[in-house]
Design a protein with these regions (language model features):
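Metal- and O2-centered redox machinery and metal/ROS homeostasis
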Residues: 1-98
Length: 98
């Protein structure tokens, strides 16, 4: 299954929030995410709904193909939906989709 077009901003946000939930559901995954990104738990809670944080969560998944594939399977989306959603959120972060 391939994507025919870029996902909507709402889909991208929802997917990123699901990715954050996926990471948070496993202490080891969450610990690795926090360690590698340098984000603290308080900062994560405070900024969880921000485009920059959500883009960062998806970017983290993009750095680990195995984790990305596990997440995609877990939530039932094609793996290529993750970089597409990242592009949408990164564009919003940069103000490209006003």
């Amino acid at each position: 299954m391939t994507l025919q077009h870029e996902p909507s901003a709402a889909f991208a946000e929802t997917l990123a929030l699901r990715a954050l939930t996926f990471l948070a559901a496993d202490g080891e995954r969450l610990g690795r995410f926090l360690s590698l990104t340098g984000i603290g738990p308080a900062e994560l809670r405070r900024n969880a709904g921000e485009s920059a944080m959500l883009a960062g969560v998806l970017e983290y998944l993009l750095q680990d193909e195995t984790l990305l594939l596990v997440f995609a399977t877990d939530v039932g989306v094609p793996p290529e939906a993750i970089p597409a959603a990242h592009r949408v959120l990164a564009g919003r972060q940069q103000g490209d989709d006003s």
